[in-house]
From Swiss-Prot:
This is Lipase chaperone. Keywords: Cell inner membrane, Cell membrane, Chaperone, Lipid degradation, Lipid metabolism, Membrane, Transmembrane, Transmembrane helix. HAMAP family: Lipase_chap. GO terms for molecular function: unfolded protein binding. SUPFAM superfamilies: Lipase chaperone-like. It is a single-pass membrane protein. It comes from Burkholderia ambifaria (strain ATCC BAA-244 / DSM 16087 / CCUG 44356 / LMG 19182 / AMMD). The chain crosses the membrane at residues 14-34. It holds the Pfam family Lipase_chap. NCBIfam families: PRK01294.1-1. Belongs to the lipase chaperone family. The gene is lifO. Its main location: membrane.
């Protein structure tokens, strides 16, 4: 295993999950091209995502195990829950997109037909025989149409981040495609994300306006911030605190601070509970790195054994399942394997 293999951004992971526990607010993430699909992170989404997005209290029926033969990126994980409203219909919630993005994390391993079959099975595992089942299938077909339309854009929609006009055009194109393909699902799927992207673009335009003095820029940025909804403003403030925590932890690690010194410093700025969570995350991370190193060594032995691709992949998948037993760990290991293979 290389020095970098198996290491997701450690400082960021510790800060996000340990110190603050809130996912960072996306910046102008739209500009990276086609929509990204969250594999291991989406696999760990909790069942209360529907409540977070305002779905009614009616619980979905208990999920039944999906069919065997899950693709390797999803091995050892389970799909996020599909939320229902009080009448038993599929709730118009971001959680539905999270479910589809979970399935899409296996896209590189599956043909289009196999991916459709996977989604059909996963929907049936939760909604078989309910009125929400055909509704979920319809939304899936709409979402696929959205992604297919994005893929047909020049360079899959990627643009030069320094070209504000191109950024504006890209955002407008995506909004139009989402509305055309998703209809009234475009708002729950992308509404909050699009608002943040428009807000960030407006900030960039002010910051890069050479006709404004620094004082005028500050005034306009402050006025723009006042237009932000209260919940969004609170989320931004938490994200700012999170980034400050990330920066502080990175600086402490860079300076070679001992675990006790780091915990004492973080206790002053983040409080004892958050500092304790950071310490626990560091211990968990060290344990993960050690286990992944052992796994990678055994994986290398399997790869060097001259097996057929099918037997090799089966043995590596079985090894992952033996060594990574906690929810999401096998998915994370598989993701790191793919990244290491791409780098070789």
């Amino acid at each position: 295993m290389t020095a970098r293999e198996g290491r997701a951004p450690r400082v960021r992971r510790v800060a996000v999950y340990g110190a603050v526990g809130l996912a960072a607010i996306a910046g102008v993430a739209i500009w990276s091209g086609a929509a990204s699909h969250r594999g291991a992170d989406t696999a760990r989404l909790s069942a209360d995502a529907a409540a977070r997005d305002g779905a009614s209290a009616a619980p979905p029926p208990p999920a039944r195990p999906a069919s065997a033969g899950m693709p390797s990126p999803l091995a050892g994980s389970s799909a996020p829950r599909l939320p229902l409203d009080a009448a038993g219909h599929l709730a118009k919630s971001r959680a539905v997109r999270d479910f589809f993005d979970y399935c899409l994390s296996a896209r590189s391993d599956l043909s289009a037909t196999a991916l459709d079959a996977l989604v059909v099975r996963e929907i049936a595992a939760q909604l078989d025989g309910t009125m929400a089942q055909p509704e979920a299938l319809d939304v899936w077909h709409r979402y696929r149409a959205y992604l297919d339309a994005l893929a047909k854009l020049p360079d899959a929609g990627a643009v030069d981040k320094s070209d504000l006009g191109a950024l504006q055009l890209a955002l407008d194109q995506r909004v139009s495609i989402a509305y055309r393909t998703l209809g009234d699902w475009s708002q729950p799927f992308f509404g909050a994300e699009q608002w943040r992207q428009r807000y960030d673009l407006a900030r960039l335009k002010i910051a890069q306006d050479r006709t404004l003095t620094e004082a005028q820029k500050a005034e306009r940025l402050a006025a723009l911030a006042q237009q932000m909804p209260g919940d969004e403003r609170a989320a931004r403030q938490k994200a700012d605190r999170q980034q400050a925590a990330i920066d502080q932890i990175a600086q402490l690690q860079k300076s070679g601070a001992t675990p006790d010194a780091m915990r004492a410093q973080l206790t002053q700025t983040l409080g004892p509970d958050a500092a304790a969570r950071v310490a626990q995350m560091q211990q968990d991370d060290a344990s993960w790195q050690s286990r992944y190193a052992d796994y990678a060594a055994q994986r290398a032995q399997i790869e060097a054994a001259g097996l057929s691709p099918q037997d090799r992949d089966a043995q590596i998948a079985a090894l992952r399942q033996r060594m990574f037993t906690k929810p999401g760990e096998a998915v994370r290991a598989a993701s790191l394997d793919r990244g290491a293979a791409a780098a070789r």
